[in-house]
Amino acid sequence: DGITPMYALRPLVEHNMADSVACEINDRIYCEPGDRMGKVAAGIWPWKCKDALFRYNEVTDTRLNQDGMAYDADSGDGTVYESNYSRQNEGGCVMFCLQEAIHNTFRDNISYDDLGGTISPSENPDALLQDNVYYVRRGVPFVRKNMDGGSFTQVNDRVVELDFAPDK
């Protein structure tokens, strides 16, 4: 993980960059103990926080693992991501992780060529996506497959298709 505040009340995370997170999450580096219950990482995200605010951050080139997205509202209440930028993260732009992540807002952000699926609502009850611009490569789904069971509301979001196909 790049930056992860935990169990915090109103943490403010701004003006940061996370680049190439999770490059070392593999069996060669993490070999003991054998079963680690998944090797997961995201760029910048909170764990069990209340009213976390993430703004003016940039996350690029996060490697695919079970997560691999730039941003992740995970098991907290009231997480806000605003005015952030993400580019070419193999797990997508943002995940709203499961039923404990409530009252999340993702607004005024730019996602450019994030891969695997731009958003992952993952059984989330109530994410709000507002005034974002997503530049999505042709062939990449907007909602990530197998992480699509939650609900979200979009208000004034723009999805712009990039004019090139995925590398083969």
Which residues does each PLM region occupy?
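Right-handed parallel beta-helix
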Residues: D1-G2, Y7-G34, V40-W45, K50-R63, ...
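Repeat-solenoid scaffold signature
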Residues: E100-A101, E123-N124, M147
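Intrinsically disordered, low-complexity regulatory regions of eukaryotic regulatory proteins
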Residues: A70-D72, N146
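Extracellular glycoside hydrolase catalytic/binding regions
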Residues: V94-F96
